[in-house]
């Protein structure tokens, strides 16, 4: 059995919340000296030897603790204790501290107060039990008083009504008792203060203690709360005992209770909520970008680091860069301010298609024609037409279909004429595609693309009746306000006329005289080459239109482009025949590449 074990202990104390506070106990040396010197004698009310027992127990406890400290601190600790100016007496001890230390419920060096928070005028229970079956609560009377939890402790003053109301309920066997306590009639000045509920347990044979019981008597009764004291009193019972509750803090409402570990969340403003949402979206987009980048790397495709840039802006930037490079390396081409506009130029389409052809030389002709059609469709989608323009386009398409039915018969009769012209264009393309020096290769590719595109335009307009050629060409280039407009139209008509004349001669003479007018000839004084260089400079304005367009001009351009694309299949078949004929007669030619020829003949962009 543990020496000085508590006879009666508190098993449960009700509260709204429990807080832990560290407590600084008084110096042990002053307590021992006050006991040994007899400064505050301990006298029991009934003259029982409990006072001497308490004194002996306290001395034994405190002397043992003092010896441990003296071994650690030695002389330094003794000098420090001797220099103390204040001496504590037993009356200044906190009853809660004395109870926890004497009953060995806590150790002095790590003493902690467990503060119980209760609501004003709300009852809470304090449960007690006896650790010895010989003690029966039916033989005792319980009385409660209220003290301030301070050093030195003092009673809570009142005038008429006691601030503490209580009701005790004893169990059937008498080993347990529950005291329902309610604290009231305290002003707001006491809110936040801590109190102690002292439970006086007195035998029925002795009078009950008064409400203003001295602190010394309470401390004496706390010392008698031990099983050893009960055994020493046998066969006489213990007459007075005291049990001190845990410190109590009183609040007026439950909302005032500060819950430890649960912070109060401040209501977020609209700006904070919006910022949090944007951060979540940004984090989600970053994760998606990583997945997309991984997919690009798996398929060996270059990942665009600016995925939110619009495709239209990128196309415009590429077209402007290509037009600027074409002006610097054009080789005799004329550049004006319209090249910097957002309208796509022919050079950008030619360069893009040329790059595509170099990477796909082994593809079939059908796949390449499908890619060209898809590129034209993408360009058409980038232009926004109004409702009125769409109606005019439908009307033009209907006229185009009617016109195509008439020209299908004419195209069968003009099969021989187209073969000679396509052979000359094929020979020029083959000459341009021969190996040259690396410094001049880029310029020759651009010039060959320009020539091939112009030859395609000439071939397309050959199917237009002669009576309508001049009007259609004039309307198509009406947007160019240049001094060379009339000369451009005249040169265009002359070229068409020369092509028709050459086709007639080649059909009668078997194409023997076609070598003199070959565009791909490398003679020093070739008239066709000089005419091509002159015409190339004049036609540059035609393929670089201005940014401000007239709705009627767009319709005419659409009409002419649709008409040229409708006869694309017949032109390619005729060009293949002309290449086979031209291989037997021209002394400068090598075997042409049909895939490069069809790729270089680009359709006109629809503006």
Swiss-Prot record:
Low complexity biased stretches: 334-363, 383-451, 568-582
Any GO BP annotation: sorocarp stalk morphogenesis
Protein name: Developmental gene 1062 protein
GO molecular function: sequence-specific DNA binding
Chain intervals with Acidic residues compositional bias: 364-382
Phylogenetic lineage: Eukaryota, Amoebozoa, Evosea, Eumycetozoa, Dictyostelia
Residue segments, region Disordered: 62-84, 334-451, 568-602
Any one annotated GO CC term: nucleus
Organism per entry: Dictyostelium discoideum
InterPro entries: CudA-like
PANTHER family for this protein: DEVELOPMENTAL GENE 1062 PROTEIN (PTHR38092:SF5), REGULATOR CUDA, PUTATIVE-RELATED (PTHR38092)
Lineage: superkingdom: Eukaryota
């Amino acid at each position: 059995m543990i020496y000085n074990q508590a006879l009666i202990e508190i098993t449960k104390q009700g509260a709204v919340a429990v807080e832990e506070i560290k407590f600084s106990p008084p110096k042990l040396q002053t307590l021992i000296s006050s006991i040994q010197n007899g400064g505050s004698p301990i006298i029991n009310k009934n003259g029982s030897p409990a006072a001497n027992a308490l004194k002996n127990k306290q001395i034994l406890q405190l002397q043992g603790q003092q010896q441990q400290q003296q071994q650690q601190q030695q002389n330094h600790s003794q000098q420090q204790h001797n220099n103390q100016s204040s001496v504590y007496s037993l009356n200044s001890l906190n009853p809660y501290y004395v109870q926890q230390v004497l009953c060995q419920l806590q150790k002095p060096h790590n003493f902690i107060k467990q503060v119980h928070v209760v609501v004003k005028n709300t009852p809470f229970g304090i449960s007690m039990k006896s650790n010895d079956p010989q003690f029966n609560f039916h033989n005792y009377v319980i009385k409660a008083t209220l003290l301030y939890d301070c050093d030195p402790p003092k009673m809570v003053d009142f005038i008429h009504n006691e601030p503490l109301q209580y009701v005790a309920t004893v169990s059937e066997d008498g080993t347990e008792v529950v005291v329902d306590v309610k604290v009231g009639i305290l002003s707001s000045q006491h809110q936040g203060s801590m109190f102690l509920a002292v439970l006086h347990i007195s035998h029925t044979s002795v009078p009950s203690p008064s409400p203003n019981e001295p602190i010394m008597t309470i401390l004496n009764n706390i010392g008698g709360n031990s099983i050893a004291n009960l055994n020493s009193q046998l066969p006489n019972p213990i007459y007075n005992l005291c049990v001190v509750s845990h410190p109590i803090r009183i609040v007026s409402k439950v909302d005032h209770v500060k819950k430890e570990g649960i912070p109060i969340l401040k209501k977020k403003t609209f700006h904070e909520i919006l910022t949090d949402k944007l951060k979540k979206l940004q984090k989600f987009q970053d994760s998606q970008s990583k997945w997309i980048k991984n997919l690009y790397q798996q398929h060996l495709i270059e990942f665009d680091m600016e995925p939110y840039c619009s495709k239209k802006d990128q196309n415009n930037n590429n077209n402007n860069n290509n037009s600027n490079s074409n002006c610097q390396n054009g080789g005799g081409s004329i550049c004006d301010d319209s090249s910097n506009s957002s309208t796509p130029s022919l050079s950008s389409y030619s360069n893009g298609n040329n790059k595509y052809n170099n990477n796909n030389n082994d593809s079939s002709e059908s796949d390449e024609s499908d890619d060209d059609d898809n590129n034209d469709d993408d360009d058409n989608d980038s232009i926004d037409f109004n409702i009125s323009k769409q109606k005019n386009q439908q009307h033009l398409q209907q006229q185009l279909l009617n016109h195509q039915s008439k020209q299908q018969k004419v195209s069968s009769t003009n099969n021989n004429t187209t073969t000679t012209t396509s052979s000359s264009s094929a020979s020029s393309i083959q000459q341009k595609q021969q190996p040259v020096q690396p410094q001049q290769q880029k310029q020759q590719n651009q010039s060959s693309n320009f020539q091939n595109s112009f030859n395609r335009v000439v071939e397309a307009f050959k199917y237009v009746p002669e009576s309508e050629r001049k009007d259609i060409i004039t309307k198509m280039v009406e947007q160019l306000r240049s001094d060379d407009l009339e000369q451009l139209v005249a040169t265009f008509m002359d070229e068409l006329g020369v092509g028709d004349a050459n086709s007639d001669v080649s059909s009668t003479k078997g194409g023997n005289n076609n070598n003199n007018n070959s565009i791909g000839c490398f003679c020093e004084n070739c008239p066709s080459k000089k005419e091509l260089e002159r015409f190339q400079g004049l036609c540059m304005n035609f393929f670089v239109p201005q940014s401000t367009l007239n709705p009627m001009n767009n319709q005419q351009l659409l009409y002419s482009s649709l008409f040229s694309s409708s006869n694309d299949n017949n032109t390619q078949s005729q060009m293949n025949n002309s290449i086979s004929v031209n291989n037997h007669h021209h002394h400068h030619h090598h075997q042409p590449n049909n895939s490069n020829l069809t790729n270089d003949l680009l359709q006109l962009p629809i503006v």
